[in-house]
Structures are given as C-alpha cells and as structure tokens.
C-alpha cells in the first residue's frame, strides 16, 4: 500500500510518501510546499491545491493520511490552517484518494510511542523507521509520520470497521407478538 501523508499549513505544507507492506516501510518521496507569503489567500490555497495534485499524480498513492487541525489559542490562525487543510482535502478528493485523518497525538503515539513527543523525537523516529541517511525537515517529517501512522493503524481500523458492520448486519431487530425484542 502506498500512503501519502500530509501536514497542512498555509505557509508550509509537508508531504511524505511511503510504501507499506505489513510492518515493512519504504521511503518513496517527501518535501515541503513553501507558499509565498506575498500572495493573496486564494492564490496561496491554489498553490497548495496544485502542488498536492501534482504530488499525487507523480507518486500515485493508494490512500492519503492527513493531520487533523488542532485548536489554537488564536482563532484566526486556526481558521487559516483549516483553509489550508481544505485545499489539501480538495486535492486529495480530486485525485480520487480515500482520506484518513489522525490527530497529532495519534500520529506521535504511533511513531514515537508517546503522544507528548517533541518534534525532534518524531524526526529521529521517522529517520530510523524509514532508514533515511539524514534527518528529514520538520514539515516533511510530520507528513511522513502521518503516513507511517496510517500504515500502522489504518489496516486495524479498516478491520474493526468491517467487523462492526458485520456485527450490525448480524443483529437484526426481532419481533415477538408485534413487539420489538433483543
């Protein structure tokens, strides 16, 4: 399974692509989309949209994983980050990719083992897990960590969803004497 991970941001959007076969991970590509701050908001969102479309076209992922926006102390920053995230979601939808979303806590826990890990710890574990020669840049490392999180957690969630659906299908409501039972 090829996973495209995205760490959305209005100034810098990180992306990382890995191949996952069971627990084996292989690095494919990563980078940071740097958006010129002089552009208007719509132009900045278009830069993110166009670049992520291109990344998806070139790397041909099977699935995408995206970090969920956290609530910042500054509501305006949170709204702007949400718009960058929206541009990323549009690019992924346009590329017909299934999108899975994870919180920063879930990503850090899946990659480092603790949800309170520092950025440097995430970078170091990404480097180790993917056998990289150097430490990836922070935005790329976060995106690769998101992809790694999905590679480790996503298949389990898929199985649980299928089991939940099967359990729901197997438990049809029953009627006895015109009343609902069980």
From Swiss-Prot:
EC number(s) from the headed UniProt entry: 3.1.21.10
Entry keyword set: Cytoplasm, DNA damage, DNA recombination, DNA repair, DNA-binding, Endonuclease, Hydrolase, Magnesium, Metal-binding, Nuclease
Listed GO biological process terms: DNA recombination; DNA repair
Main location: cytoplasm
Catalysed reactions, as listed in the record: Endonucleolytic cleavage at a junction such as a reciprocal single-stranded crossover between two homologous DNA duplexes (Holliday junction)
Any one Pfam family match given in the protein's UniProt record, by short name: RuvC
InterPro entries (alphabetical): RNaseH-like_sf, RNaseH_sf, X-over_junc_endoDNase_Mg_BS, X-over_junc_endoDNase_RuvC
Annotated active site: 7, 67, 139
Record note on cofactor: Binds 2 Mg(2+) ion per subunit.
Binding residue positions for Mg(2+) 2: 67
GO molecular function: crossover junction DNA endonuclease activity; DNA binding; magnesium ion binding
Gene Ontology cellular component list: cytoplasm; Holliday junction resolvase complex
Positions bound to Mg(2+) 1: 7, 139
Necessary cofactors: Mg(2+)
Subcellular location as annotated: Cytoplasm
PANTHER family found in the cross-reference section: CROSSOVER JUNCTION ENDODEOXYRIBONUCLEASE RUVC (PTHR30194:SF3)
HAMAP family: RuvC
Recorded family membership: Belongs to the RuvC family.
Subunit note: Homodimer which binds Holliday junction (HJ) DNA. The HJ becomes 2-fold symmetrical on binding to RuvC with unstacked arms; it has a different conformation from HJ DNA in complex with RuvA. In the full resolvosome a probable DNA-RuvA(4)-RuvB(12)-RuvC(2) complex forms which resolves the HJ.
Entry function: The RuvA-RuvB-RuvC complex processes Holliday junction (HJ) DNA during genetic recombination and DNA repair. Endonuclease that resolves HJ intermediates. Cleaves cruciform DNA by making single-stranded nicks across the HJ at symmetrical positions within the homologous arms, yielding a 5'-phosphate and a 3'-hydroxyl group; requires a central core of homology in the junction. The consensus cleavage sequence is 5'-(A/T)TT(C/G)-3'. Cleavage occurs on the 3'-side of the TT dinucleotide at the point of strand exchange.
Record's protein name: Crossover junction endodeoxyribonuclease RuvC
Species of provenance: Bordetella parapertussis (strain 12822 / ATCC BAA-587 / NCTC 13253)
High-level lineage: Bacteria, Pseudomonadati, Pseudomonadota, Betaproteobacteria, Burkholderiales
Gene: ruvC
């Amino acid at each position: 399974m090829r996973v495209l991970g995205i760490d959305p941001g209005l100034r810098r959007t990180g992306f990382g692509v890995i191949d996952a076969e069971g627990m084996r991970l292989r690095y494919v590509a990563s980078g940071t989309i740097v958006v010129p701050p002089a552009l208007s908001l719509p132009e900045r969102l278009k830069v993110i949209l166009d670049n992520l479309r291109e990344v998806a076209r070139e790397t041909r992922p099977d699935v995408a994983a995206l970090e969920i926006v956290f609530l910042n102390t500054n509501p305006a920053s949170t709204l702007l980050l949400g718009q960058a995230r929206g541009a990323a979601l549009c690019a992924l939808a346009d590329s017909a990719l299934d999108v899975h979303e994870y919180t920063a806590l879930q990503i850090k826990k899946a990659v480092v083992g603790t949800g309170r890990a520092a950025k440097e710890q995430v970078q170091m574990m990404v480097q180790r897990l993917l056998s990289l020669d150097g430490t990836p840049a922070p935005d790329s490392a976060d995106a690769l960590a998101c992809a790694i999180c999905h590679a480790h957690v996503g298949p389990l969630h898929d199985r649980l969803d299928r089991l939940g659906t099967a359990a729901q299908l197997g438990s049809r409501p029953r009627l006895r004497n015109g009343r609902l039972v069980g």
